[in-house]
């Protein structure tokens, strides 16, 4: 019998079974369930985090063995989370997707002091400027930890940004004291997501850390390309149909003008074209007595204004030009998120 089977069949105290049942109920009530690291978070701050999460997520802290048993009882692939239950951890459940959960947890982190013996999560820098500390022994403490410090203008000044500890190095008691004196909080305290399970898929933090601006830009560009493909391939969708109808209307109007097809929408333009041609012809006749009264005195330069075929095309295709403008706008990467999402989603 495997260790897992033994763990499932062994008898445990009633209070433990009740705790496991409560954890199982919590797990089954959410779409996404993850494991978070809570090491180093003071209990009061942990309670504040629980309160802040209320309404969007639930944090459950218990013995690791009971968390593992509950995940095994639920099954459905959730037992894969057992590999992340080490040290001080808790389970977090939410109906949000894993990406939203990760972003929420990252945004909720707050700066905190770093103590002696802790490992620097990033380079620790004492910034250039006035420390606000009066001249005294503190200048020597700054210099001893690697800061470029001097006494100037009646106070202790740091003359340039000074990196006093590199990422991954251990913080000394002396450096911890200096940082606390300066009010520098080089670490962030919060719930670190180790893994989250949703819709049968296990996600790790590296897969959830997205550049939102870049992602939005990619979606907008894809939406623009999809819009143009739909228009140019004559493949109508709910989003592109209005533009395609405008283009078709412009083409039909241009054809009607060139072929002199009598249509209620085209007749005014046909009359204008014929009038211009008559006036152009009249301007070439020297004997005004041969002309109707309304055409007498027509200036010769009017002939130069006779519409050409190209000009007819331009006049007839105003709606077509509007359609082209609409298509070009769809290719602009600066389209708002809603238009981009609608265009891409409605493509096929």
Curated annotation (Swiss-Prot):
**Where is there biased composition of kind Acidic residues?**
302-341
- Where are the stretches annotated Disordered? 284-348
GO MF terms here are:
large ribosomal subunit rRNA binding; structural constituent of ribosome
Q: Which residues form a coiled coil?
A: none
Q: Which Gene3D superfamilies match?
A: 3.30.70.1730, 3.90.105.20, 6.10.140.760
Quaternary structure (record): Part of the 50S ribosomal subunit. Forms part of the ribosomal stalk which helps the ribosome interact with GTP-bound translation factors. Forms a heptameric L10(L12)2(L12)2(L12)2 complex, where L10 forms an elongated spine to which the L12 dimers bind in a sequential fashion.
Q: Which NCBIfam families match?
A: PRK04019.1-4, PRK04019.1-5
State the remark under miscellaneous: Has been called L10e and L10E in this organism; in this case 'e/E' is for E.coli-like, not eukaryotic-type protein.
The entry sums up its family as follows:
Belongs to the universal ribosomal protein uL10 family.
Q: What is this protein called?
A: Large ribosomal subunit protein uL10
* Annotated source species: Haloarcula marismortui (strain ATCC 43049 / DSM 3752 / JCM 8966 / VKM B-1809)
Quote the gene name from the UniProt entry. Answer: rpl10
């Amino acid at each position: 019998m495997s260790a897992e089977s033994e763990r499932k069949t062994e008898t445990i105290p009633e209070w433990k079974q009740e705790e496991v049942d409560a954890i199982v109920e919590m797990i089954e009530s959410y779409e996404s369930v993850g494991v978070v690291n809570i090491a180093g978070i003071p209990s009061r701050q942990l309670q504040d985090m629980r309160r802040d999460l209320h309404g969007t997520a639930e944090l459950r802290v218990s013995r690791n063995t009971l968390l593992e048993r509950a995940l095994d009882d639920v099954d459905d692939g959730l037992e894969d989370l057992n590999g992340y239950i080490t040290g001080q951890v808790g389970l977090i459940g939410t109906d949000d997707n894993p990406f939203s959960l990760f972003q929420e947890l990252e945004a909720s982190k707050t700066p905190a002091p770093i103590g002696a013996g802790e490992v620097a999560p990033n380079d620790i820098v004492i910034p250039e400027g006035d420390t606000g500390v009066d001249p005294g022994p503190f200048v020597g403490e700054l210099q001893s930890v690697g800061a470029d410090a001097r006494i100037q203008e009646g106070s202790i000044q740091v003359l340039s940004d000074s990196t006093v500890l590199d990422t991954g190095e251990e913080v000394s008691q002396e450096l911890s004291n200096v940082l606390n004196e300066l009010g520098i909080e080089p670490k962030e305290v919060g719930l670190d997501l180790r893994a989250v399970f949703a819709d049968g898929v296990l996600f790790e933090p590296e897969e959830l850390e997205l550049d939102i601006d870049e992602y939005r830009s990619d979606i907008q560009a894809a939406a623009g390309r999809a819009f143009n493909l739909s228009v140019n391939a004559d493949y109508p969708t709910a989003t592109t149909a209005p533009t395609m109808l405008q283009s078709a209307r412009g083409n039909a109007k241009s054809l009607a003008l060139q072929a002199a097809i009598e249509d209620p929408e085209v007749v005014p333009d046909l009359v204008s074209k014929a009038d211009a041609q008559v006036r152009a012809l009249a301007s070439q006749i020297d004997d005004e007595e041969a002309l109707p009264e309304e055409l007498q005195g027509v200036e010769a330069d009017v002939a130069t204004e006779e519409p050409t075929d190209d000009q007819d095309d331009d006049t007839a295709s105003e709606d077509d030009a509007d359609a082209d403008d609409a298509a070009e706008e769809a290719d602009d990467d600066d389209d708002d998120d809603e238009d981009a999402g609608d265009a891409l989603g409605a493509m096929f």
